[in-house]
Amino acid sequence: MSADCEGNSTCPANSTEEDPPVGMEGQGSLKLVFTVLSAVMVGLVMFSFGCSVESRKLWLHLRRPWGIAVGLLCQFGLMPLTAYLLAIGFGLKPFQAIAVLIMGSCPGGTVSNVLTFWVDGDMDLSISMTTCSTVAALGMMPLCLYVYTRSWTLPQSLTIPYQSIGITLVSLVVPVASGIYVNYRWPKQATFILKVGAAVGGMLLLVVAVTGVVLAKGWNIDVTLLVISCIFPLVGHVMGFLLAFLTHQSWQRCRTISIETGAQNIQLCIAMMQLSFSAEYLVQLLNFALAYGLFQVLHGLLIVAAYQAYKRRQKSQYRRQHPECQDISSEKQPRETSAFLDKGAEAAVTLGLEQHHRTAELTSHVPSCE
């Protein structure tokens, strides 16, 4: 993986002795905001979502990993290929194309777990996919970059941020394992922690979105990269949903895989860019990564809003057709989908894909006054 970055220019490895170029001075506050929010989100949100995971269901996912396999195919098959096609289609410069490929080769991020919760996705599958994709990134990131960057040349090999990947793994596994233990020992307290964590995670996403919009005025980014950062996560969501649908996953899993596919780990992408490019190019490339992170949050919030609106509309229509539901003071079901969806998801792992489809089709018509 070596050649020219921009005509006769080169992309030497990042040097700590170089002064930041013009335009980077104002990024300190932005980097600090995203770093702090990411740390809080990874710690608190993953612990709270771990409280929604049952060890038995998690083990079933790992024993028969149909959903995880489809998710990994989307993550390290569709996303790098999409990045390559976007780079070719938009005629990007070599260093810009490499940055887009780095983003497409990254594993899923924590944002996907928050969004999955709010679209009633399969949290066990979501957390399993995030963890497994991070582990797989140790080998798949260099493989994908080796395959797709051969169309361009760099004067120096790209550097995989193995330390950052290790830190990400620890920040995922430890809080989730703690949450699973809390759910096993104190299920009532775990439900409360889950609600608090989901609310905090949602607010953090809003803060990230607002902060990004406010600070985006000073971003120095190529218009083409800005357009790609907007459409790339959308393409990931759509392609992930279609592949999950074509492989006969349940609607719940289709939503989960769709969210997981489009939401990338921005921190790993930034870490790799800092290790692989000089400060001369980091101005545009870091802003591309931040823009992608902003758009994936904005797209995710729109998806959540659309799903919640659809859910309320369906519930309202059902209640109008069944007035007896108005007289039922129903208790709140567990936040992670309804009971019949949980049974359907378990059936998917136990019975196989075809039986699960029949189960899902039957249970999807179960009336509910919730």
From Swiss-Prot:
InterPro entries: BilAc:Na_symport/Acr3, Bilac:Na_transpt, Na+/solute_symporter_sf. It is found in: Membrane. Belongs to the bile acid:sodium symporter (BASS) (TC 2.A.28) family. This is Sodium-dependent organic anion transporter. The chain crosses the membrane at residues 33-53, 68-88, 98-118, 127-147, 160-180, 196-216, 225-245, 266-283, 285-305. The gene is Slc10a6. Glycans are attached at residues 8, 14. It comes from Rattus norvegicus. It comes from the Eukaryota. Transports sulfoconjugated steroid hormones from the extracellular compartment into the cytosol in a sodium-dependent manner without hydrolysis. Steroid sulfate hormones are commonly considered to be biologically inactive metabolites, that may be activated by steroid sulfatases into free steroids. May play an important role by delivering sulfoconjugated steroids to specific target cells in reproductive organs. May play a role transporting the estriol precursor 16alpha-hydroxydehydroepiandrosterone 3-sulfate (16a-OH-DHEAS) at the fetal blood vessel endothelium. One of its GO terms (cellular component) is membrane. Glycosylated. Residues 54-67, 119-126, 181-195, 246-265, 306-370 are cytoplasmic. Keywords: Glycoprotein, Ion transport, Lipid transport, Membrane, Sodium, Sodium transport, Symport, Transmembrane, Transmembrane helix, Transport.
